[in-house]
């Protein structure tokens, strides 16, 4: 870990570059265009349907 004490500034520069690159990439995203042209979701199957019929709660008088 001695190299980290000597080269902490390099690690900081790499992290700052990643942060700046991420912000730039997110600014290029056009959410309204995506929402207008988004693909339809395929129908999903309810995997809990077979357990929904079981009633584990006690009956109320």
UniProtKB/Swiss-Prot annotation:
Residues 51-61 have a biased composition (Acidic residues). Residues 37-61 are annotated as: Disordered. Keywords: Cell membrane, Membrane, Transmembrane, Transmembrane helix. Residues 37-47 have a biased composition (Basic and acidic residues). It is found in: Cell membrane. Its main location: membrane. GO terms for cellular component: plasma membrane. The chain crosses the membrane at residues 3-23. The keyword Disulfide bond does not apply. It is a single-pass membrane protein. Belongs to the UPF0370 family. This is UPF0370 protein SG1720. It comes from Sodalis glossinidius (strain morsitans).
């Amino acid at each position: 870990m001695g190299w980290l004490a000597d080269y902490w500034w390099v690690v900081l520069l790499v992290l700052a570059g990643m942060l700046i690159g991420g912000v730039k990439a997110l600014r290029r995203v056009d959410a309204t265009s995506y929402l207008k042209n988004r693909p339809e979701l395929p129908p999903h199957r309810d995997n809990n349907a077979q357990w929904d019929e079981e009633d584990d709660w006690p009956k109320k008088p």
